[in-house]
């Protein structure tokens, strides 16, 4: 009887993980190989906005790149990963200090998950009296976790003064977070902490350093069109030329 109850519980978790609809608060999509994109949602000024993030399954455990924007999904994400892959999350990187990226640092740190930011992000969180990561890393750091290697890199200011990208050279996956706008974006979105003039320089650095990406994951909206980095550069150039306005 106890074994049957365990099976029923496991199937319930699986159903919650895989039975996703477009209305699910947590949506997980397979990208390629051991890479998965997950999407959560947040009510921003009366509009429900999606946020994309990434996780990587390794032999040692799962690595998260950014936390859910919806704090009610912090634990369901861990549960879904456990049900789908039978692995624990062991590391979490925040790609800048905004809530849609760093909001889960404290939750995951309390779970015993190693959390990481660069120094600039740590300083911003400290100044705002917000919870910080356990580990502070340099602006260009390469990690090997299990069978995978990835590079965490700060290209310069852009959407935020501390935005980083993550590059997986073997698979040619570029995780851009909010540094890269969706190819369907009409403007640059929130610019409260942005440096749009420097953003153009930073994009060109990324284009030069990480050539021929096969997958590019944007911070919001549709991420499947890999012209997103070029499109972001186009939006930035239009903004700097005074030909485009944006939200504040």
Residue ranges and their predicted role:
Residues 34, 56, 66, 81, ...:
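Divalent metal-coordination and catalytic microenvironments
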Residues 59-61, 72-116:
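Active-site metal-binding motif and surrounding structural segment of the metallo-beta-lactamase
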Residues 37-39, 55, 63-65, 90-94, ...:
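Structural recognition of the beta-strand scaffold that forms the well-ordered cores
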Residues 4-13:
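Sec-dependent N-terminal signal peptides
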Residues 22-31, 61-62, 69-70, 116-227, ...:
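Metallo-beta-lactamase
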Residues 30-77, 165-178:
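Conserved beta-strand hairpin/beta-sheet module of binuclear metal-dependent hydrolase folds
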Residues 14-25, 197-248:
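Accessory terminal helices/loops
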């Amino acid at each position: 009887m106890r074994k049957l109850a365990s099976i029923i519980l496991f199937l319930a978790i699986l159903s919650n993980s895989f039975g996703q609809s477009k209305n699910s608060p947590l949506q997980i999509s397979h990208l390629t190989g051991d890479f998965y994109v997950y999407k959560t949602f947040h009510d921003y000024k009366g509009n429900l906005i999606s946020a994309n993030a990434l996780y990587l399954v390794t032999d040692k455990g799962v690595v998260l790149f950014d936390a859910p924007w919806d704090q009610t999904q912090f634990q369901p994400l861990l549960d879904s990963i456990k049900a789908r892959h039978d692995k624990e999350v062991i590391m979490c990187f925040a790609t800048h200090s905004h809530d849609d990226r760093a909001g889960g640092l404290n939750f995951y740190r309390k779970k015993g998950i190693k959390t990481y930011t660069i120094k600039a992000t740590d300083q911003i969180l400290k100044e705002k009296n917000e919870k910080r990561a356990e580990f502070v890393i340099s602006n260009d750091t390469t990690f090997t976790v299990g069978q995978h290697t990835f590079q965490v890199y700060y290209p310069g200011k852009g959407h935020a003064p501390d935005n980083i990208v993550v590059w997986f050279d073997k698979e040619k996956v570029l995780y851009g977070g909010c540094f890269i706008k969706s190819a369907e974006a009409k403007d640059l979105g929130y610019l409260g902490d942005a440096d749009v003039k420097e953003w153009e320089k930073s994009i060109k650095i990324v284009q030069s350093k990480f050539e021929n990406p096969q997958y590019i994951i944007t911070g919001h909206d549709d991420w499947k069109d890999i012209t997103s980095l070029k499109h972001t550069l186009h939006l930035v150039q239009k903004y700097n030329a005074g030909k485009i306005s944006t939200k504040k």
